């Protein structure tokens, strides 16, 4: 048996007022087991009456049983899922198969039985699937919410100083948009954005979170004494109900290449709760696309695939899989960062308007491309990054993942061409990027490029769900061939300049070697290595 803290019960009661079909409780329930199905004989499962506590879960509804006489312990916990067998028995009873138990629940009133029946129907096929469920595979959703249910993953995002500080600055810098307003936080996670909204003077914040992180957000709300301001609601925005419309929607819905994870569709769906002339933070997103040249990256992926070109690997011929291996490696988008000087043309910008675009607009995104090439070289593929703007009443604030901006946990993304193309300065590179949404909460990315006025073209289709995380933390190197002066002479000139600054130390017995050091004793390190 596990303990049920009083605050958990209060949370369930609070959530019930907002989403009654997935968060509610029933007292005075007599629970019986079916001892003999043919004779319909029943035995009491628990001594005395019980209370059923229903709470939302990404897979359905969790049903916890506690005694009416002692609510401090959970007697049993069940999961009501889409395949749960259940049937009404008379006006106050309900038969349900949970795990290995065939139970009959006798409720204290007709109304309680009817509401419980709706709870069950809410997660069964009797009820139409939500927009989220229709577009998402169950296995993908389960993995997704499990991932974001870990504190370590929330910490990874919260410790992105650029991300977190930009959101706080955008919200606090536009306090007039939040003062005494009703705010909706979509995909709240730890609730950090909800806290920022309260700092800006929000009257009420509804923090919606579908993963198990909701329980931790609730703990933070209570420990910071803002439960009168922030209401944490476990559930998906596509499925929960709010008691009122909101003035502002805040969220951090961006994924790699802006669109990955398809959280933007959830963000747009939340507009059904937004008052006319309401605000969205962020307001719009710009996806930037540019052709790039990087022989090192291309060779790295190509050589990985050549593993499968071995004809005698421990006596086994692998070459039959070389073609498939090559295809798999080049289907992987590369997540890392780079020097923007590898880009061969000015980026093309594709705008997503969070205030006006529709969810359906993000199911198939077609982006026409036209690049005027600025430098001759080999185009190995396309680079992607995004910026989002917070358009506030007082000021506009930008969050950028550009290679010229401070690095964020989104990095940048590059998509390689299996067959690179040589292109000259002054030529025009045209084509299209097609982002086709899939039920794995991601996109299939198809690239088609063509050098205008020629027969030269190249294409590739990549799986954004399966990226290669290449970033190592090492400093970004300048592209080869970008030095216009001798790097060696530049370095020694810098050293000599530093040495002249320290020359005065030599007059006081200091030691200087090649201009390095200020009274540094190098013999200690040579004779006594650590």
From Swiss-Prot:
Biological process, per Gene Ontology: chromatin remodeling; peptidyl-arginine methylation, to asymmetrical-dimethyl arginine; positive regulation of ecdysone receptor signaling pathway; positive regulation of transcription by RNA polymerase II; regulation of DNA-templated transcription
Listed Pfam families: PrmA, PRMT_C
CDD domains: AdoMet_MTases (cd02440)
Gene Ontology CC annotations of this record: cytoplasm; cytosol; histone methyltransferase complex; nucleus
GO molecular function annotation: histone H3R17 methyltransferase activity; histone H3R2 methyltransferase activity; histone H3R26 methyltransferase activity; protein-arginine omega-N asymmetric methyltransferase activity; protein-arginine omega-N monomethyltransferase activity
Reaction(s) catalysed by this chain's protein: L-arginyl-[protein] + 2 S-adenosyl-L-methionine = N(omega),N(omega)-dimethyl-L-arginyl-[protein] + 2 S-adenosyl-L-homocysteine + 2 H(+)
Post-translational modification comment from the UniProt entry: The dimethylated protein is the major form.
EC code(s) of this entry: 2.1.1.319
Function text: Methylates (mono- and asymmetric dimethylation) the guanidino nitrogens of arginyl residues in proteins. May methylate histone H3 at 'Arg-17' and activate transcription via chromatin remodeling.
Lineage: Eukaryota, Metazoa, Ecdysozoa, Arthropoda, Hexapoda
Binding site for S-adenosyl-L-methionine: 154, 163, 187, 209, 238, 266
Keywords: Chromatin regulator, Cytoplasm, Methylation, Methyltransferase, Nucleus, S-adenosyl-L-methionine, Transcription, Transcription regulation, Transferase
Name of the featured protein: Histone-arginine methyltransferase CARMER
Modified residues (Asymmetric dimethylarginine): 501
Family: Belongs to the class I-like SAM-binding methyltransferase superfamily. Protein arginine N-methyltransferase family.
Quaternary structure note: Homodimer.
InterPro entries recorded: Arg_MeTrfase, PH-like_dom_sf, PRMT_dom, SAM-dependent_MTases_sf
Gene source species: Drosophila erecta (Fruit fly)
